[in-house]
Amino acid sequence: MRIVINGFGRIGRLVLRQILKRNAPIEVVAINDLVSGDLLTYLFKYDSTHGSFASQATFSDGCLVVGERKIRFLAEKDVQKLPWKDLDVDVVVESTGLFVNKDDAAKHLDSGAKRVLITAPAKGDVPTFVMGVNHQKFDPANDVIISNASCTTNCLAPLAKVLLDNFGIEEGLMTTVHAATATQSVVDGPSRKDWRGGRGAFQNIIPASTGAAKAVGLCLPELKGKLTGMAFRVPVADVSVVDLTVKLSSATTYEAVCEAVKHAASTSMRNIMHYTEEAVVSSDFIGCEYSSVFDAQAGVALNDRFFKLIAWYDNEIGYATRIVDLLEYIQGNSK
């Protein structure tokens, strides 16, 4: 599979790290970003959260060079001028955060790419796939522009599926206590869209909106209209946690819920979910590749149908790992 990464920010860089780490059978032929290639190489090589890249990475002749791999840097703002046809691109990993609706993403197809994977919640009629939840429904003939949802949906949806399959869900409210991201301000500044979002990221707990819970309905249609939620942005650089307050359809115990999650984590959700009874905190999950880590000690039951459940996730590495998983799944099911 030949891919390009459009947008080499936090997610784009970590997707490449994960591809190289696992030596995935994916050839990254180009990176398109308006930042200079030498600076992008520096940002790829050194990461304040995840540490320095394990192998040597250098910038040479307009390329990022890692071992035997040479990845060409492009800096083209107009997507329709990108040479995807000449490069024989199978999939564009669209990680700018800008081309999230179908019409904009389709410009990559006009440039010659065969498929587009949006690494964010998509707008409009774009199929959403979450590994471990509904990825088997991917149709290579028709699903040309797809979304991998958000990091939070990738944490919540596997947990919701386990609950749905075992007990049924009547309704639920989710809060994600979410690490700061690059769109936030270090100190107070104007934010026209969200006034509170412009306040200093490392001085405040900031309430914010999120469509992550509603988006679960895109990959689990049975839950459409049954889940919603909000976010608190908090002063940590990485790792977030989902707090799901949920009313189940059938009576059960907290112990039975834990057992169902534990079983799924070792079978149908293996490598997607993890189960822990350890006394963990957020920094314990920096670099964690699971989508969702169920914290059995942190949850609580009000009665036999009403529960508060807690799941951790590295909102950067965990999500980037699922993107690579989805790319490999597409590769294996597009022949």
Swiss-Prot record:
NAD(+) binds at residues 10-11, 33, 77, 119, 315. It catalyses: D-glyceraldehyde 3-phosphate + phosphate + NAD(+) = (2R)-3-phospho-glyceroyl phosphate + NADH + H(+). Pfam families: Gp_dh_C (PF02800), Gp_dh_N (PF00044). The record marks 178 as: Activates thiol group during catalysis. GO terms for molecular function: glyceraldehyde-3-phosphate dehydrogenase (NAD+) (phosphorylating) activity; NAD binding; NADP binding. D-glyceraldehyde 3-phosphate binds at residues 150-152, 181, 210-211, 233. GO terms for cellular component: cytoplasm. Keywords: Cytoplasm, Glycolysis, NAD, Nucleotide-binding, Oxidoreductase. Its main location: cytoplasm. InterPro entries: GlycerAld/Erythrose_P_DH, GlycerAld_3-P_DH_AS, GlycerAld_3-P_DH_cat, GlycerAld_3-P_DH_NAD(P)-bd, Glyceraldehyde-3-P_DH_1, NAD(P)-bd_dom_sf. The keyword NAD applies. The active site is at residue 151. Belongs to the glyceraldehyde-3-phosphate dehydrogenase family. Homotetramer. NCBIfam families: GAPDH-I (TIGR01534). This is Glyceraldehyde-3-phosphate dehydrogenase. It comes from Chlamydia muridarum (strain MoPn / Nigg). The gene is gap.
